């Protein structure tokens, strides 16, 4: 199948980054014998804009996507996280290529209002929506036109290459990495845990409580030293929702602790998550 994948590829970023959700999706498509072309909406907008001011290139990016669809004739278009590609553009694609399937894949939480609005807008025009939240909480989008599916955060074997479950010499007993503070009070829980364990274990909280965040290879090096980690979302309670922290930890054999309200005990093996 010929796939056109619309997402942000960070073509203008040259510093320490790690594999993205979108990149893992693309690797998976290729591994399953599909041909994939990428359209990095934010980069195209910046390339097309006067003086490289991305916001001035939004209309041009939509035109370029239409041009790419016409030039490549994809069987499937996967729309990832985008605030640039419009519903009107997707409707034009529908008119011009009625046999092409459109799906939206979304890995962001529903408690962020702009993301919920984005899902609803795309659900009105695409064939299916895949979200890293369970169907129980996706019912709010029922009746908008698209079929709704849960999709777990992907683990990529060329990225998650460790198996810490087989190691006994790891210096970091417990880990929590995050510098996000919007829509959350989770640092209160992290502080309580940090105070409770005291000097009994080596608990690293990169990005919080004065410890600098780690990115790219530095983050990978931290994971390579870690026994256990906290998988805490900015808000808890959405069915089966988690950030891609779950795949980064589980894929590398790190035992993780998650909030019970997410319901992961319904399908995640007990030996991988508490």
Describe the function of each predicted region.
Residues 100-115:
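A short, histidine- and acid-enriched strand-loop-helix "catalytic/donor-clamping" loop
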Residues 55, 79-80:
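Short gly/ser-rich anion-binding loops that grip negatively charged ligand groups
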Residues 1-51, 64, 71-72, 81-88, ...:
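Nucleotide-sugar donor-binding catalytic core of glycosyltransferases
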Residues 80-81, 94-102:
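Short, conserved structural micro-motifs that define repeat-unit consensus positions
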Residues 57-58, 97, 251:
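Short alpha-helix boundary/capping motifs
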Residues 54-68:
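A short, well-structured beta->alpha microelement
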Residues 75:
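Short acidic/polar active-site loop segments enriched in Thr and Asp
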Residues 90-97, 194:
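Surface-exposed amphipathic alpha-helices with a cationic face
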């Amino acid at each position: 199948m010929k796939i056109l994948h619309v997402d942000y590829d960070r073509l203008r970023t040259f510093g320490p980054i790690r594999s993205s959700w979108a990149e893992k999706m693309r690797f998976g498509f290729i591994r399953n014998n599909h041909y994939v072309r990428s359209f990095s909406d934010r980069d195209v907008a910046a390339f097309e804009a006067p003086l490289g001011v991305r916001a001035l290139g939004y209309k041009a990016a939509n035109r370029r996507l239409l041009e790419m669809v016409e030039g490549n004739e994809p069987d499937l278009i996967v729309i990832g996280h985008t605030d640039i590609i419009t519903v009107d553009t997707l409707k034009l694609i529908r008119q011009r290529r009625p046999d092409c399937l459109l799906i939206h894949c979304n890995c962001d939480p529903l408690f962020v209002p702009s993301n919920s609005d984005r899902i609803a807008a795309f659900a009105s025009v695409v064939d299916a929506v895949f979200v890293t939240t369970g169907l129980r909480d996706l019912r709010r989008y029922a009746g908008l036109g698209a079929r709704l599916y849960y999709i777990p955060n992907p683990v990529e074997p060329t990225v998650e290459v460790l198996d810490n479950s087989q190691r006994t010499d790891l210096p970091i007993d417990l880990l929590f990495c995050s510098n996000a503070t919007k829509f959350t009070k989770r640092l209160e829980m992290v502080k309580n845990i940090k105070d409770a364990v005291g000097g009994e274990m080596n608990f690293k909280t990169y990005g919080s409580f004065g410890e600098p965040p780690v990115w790219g290879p530095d983050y990978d090096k931290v994971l390579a030293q870690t026994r256990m980690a906290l998988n805490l979302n900015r808000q808890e309670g959405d069915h089966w929702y988690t950030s891609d922290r779950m795949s980064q930890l589980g894929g590398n054999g790190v035992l993780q602790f998650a909030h019970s309200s997410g319901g992961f005990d319904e399908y995640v093996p007990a030996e991988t998550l508490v």
